[in-house]
């Protein structure tokens, strides 16, 4: 349900037509990577975004456990004139909890959560390195720590574009909310920051069905 709530929050606030495509490994014959390190396919398939976009234009990747509270075209306009390879919020934090929802282990590593929200410049040579072959074989470190790019070519977005609920101090001006510990639909997370907004969005979505 989290994906549909996020998609609804994007579409209803966008000032221009937006195409939203879920990345589903079962619909990606190019993705052949096995569970070699215990990670899920979603850990890696996000890096196929430039390939799936034909290495043309800009593409925005978002984790599904988010909520958009702004016109999403703002972030694309913010990055449109840059030649950087990719734009992210450059989080620098240590997770407060050792586990996430459903008991999942909270791994700690450099550039953690940078890849949860990425604006790709698909024309960039670095993005063209993200071929199915590379995504199928490269290490998680190579992908998630942006070794396919370089630090000076990773553009920085303001923190309100990927506000980590439960990790950062409350921010009423957050534009994209990230329920990184667990979405409000999970027990124990229904009273967290921006939970009311998430449930309201879900109700508006269901009312349109």
PLM regions: where:
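N-terminal anchoring/stem segment of glycosyltransferases
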Residues: 1-45, 52-55, 196-209
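A glycosyltransferase accessory/donor-loop signature
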Residues: 16, 22-24, 117-209
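A short acidic, often aromatic-flanked loop/helix-cap motif at beta-alpha or helix-coil junctions
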Residues: 26-31, 94-96, 162-166
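Short, surface-exposed amphipathic charged segments that create phosphate/polyanion-binding patches used
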Residues: 33-40, 100-105, 171-174
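GT-A fold catalytic core of metal-dependent nucleotide-sugar glycosyltransferases
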Residues: 45-95, 119
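A general structural signal for short secondary-structure junctions and capping/turn motifs
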Residues: 51, 76-79, 107-110, 145-149, ...
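Short, well-ordered loop/turn elements at secondary-structure boundaries
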Residues: 55-56, 82, 112-114, 150-151, ...
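Conserved catalytic core of nucleotide-sugar-dependent glycosyltransferases
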Residues: 78-143
